[in-house]
Amino acid sequence: MTIERTFSIVKPNAVAKNAIGSIYARFESAGFTLVAAKMLRLSREQAEGFYAEHKGKPFFDGLVEFMMSGPIMVQVLEGENAVQRNRDIMGATNPANALAGTLRADYADSFTANAVHGSDSIESAQREIAYFFSDDEICPRA
């Protein structure tokens, strides 16, 4: 197995529910190590830049508004096959299709307010990590 890093966001609806600690506990119980984390409130420029690949899609404006609606937590998770394992823990993007026990089944409110974001590939993880963290903000713990 390969040790990877993946990027994750706890979205505004999950932060508003005070679910940060519960979500972090799930990450750690699954064997992930948090190597970087911070809370922030996205500006329009940050939200549009982060989701630029979705610009022009029908859900883009609503997603940007939602991501600006409150504080978020951004974090870097490290572990074996981190990208795929985090996606498994999150559950389906549409919470109506998320398996019981996944983060989205437990904390999502809707397709947009689906509690968490996670990178979909190693390449996306690298790009997304670099969007929010400088190299000196990442603290390997092993």
Curated annotation (Swiss-Prot):
Q: What is its main location?
A: cytoplasm
Coiled-coil stretches, from where to where?
Answer: none
Please provide an example of a Pfam family that matches this protein in its UniProt record.
NDK
Q: What is this enzyme's EC?
A: 2.7.4.6
Binding positions for ATP per the UniProt entry:
K11, F59, R87, T93, R104, N114
Q: Which UniProt keywords apply?
A: ATP-binding, Cytoplasm, Kinase, Magnesium, Metal-binding, Nucleotide metabolism, Nucleotide-binding, Phosphoprotein, Transferase
The source's superkingdom equals: Bacteria
**Catalytic positions?**
H117 (pros-phosphohistidine intermediate)
What catalytic reaction does the record list?
Answer: a 2'-deoxyribonucleoside 5'-diphosphate + ATP = a 2'-deoxyribonucleoside 5'-triphosphate + ADP; a ribonucleoside 5'-diphosphate + ATP = a ribonucleoside 5'-triphosphate + ADP
GO CC annotation: cytoplasm
Which InterPro entries does the protein's record reference? NDK-like_dom, NDK-like_dom_sf, Nucleoside_diP_kinase, Nucleoside_diP_kinase_AS
Give this protein's Gene Ontology molecular function annotations.
ATP binding; metal ion binding; nucleoside diphosphate kinase activity
Task: Name the coenzymes or cofactors required.
Answer: Mg(2+)
List GO BP terms, alphabetically.
CTP biosynthetic process; GTP biosynthetic process; UTP biosynthetic process
SMART domains associated with the record: NDK
The protein's location, in the record's own words, is: Cytoplasm
Give the family this protein belongs to, as stated in its UniProt record: Belongs to the NDK family.
NCBIfam families per UniProt: PRK00668.1
Q: What does this protein do?
A: Major role in the synthesis of nucleoside triphosphates other than ATP. The ATP gamma phosphate is transferred to the NDP beta phosphate via a ping-pong mechanism, using a phosphorylated active-site intermediate.
Binding partners and assembly: Homotetramer.
Q: What is the name of this protein?
A: Nucleoside diphosphate kinase
Look up and give the organism this protein is from.
Pectobacterium carotovorum subsp. carotovorum (strain PC1)
Q: Which gene encodes it?
A: ndk
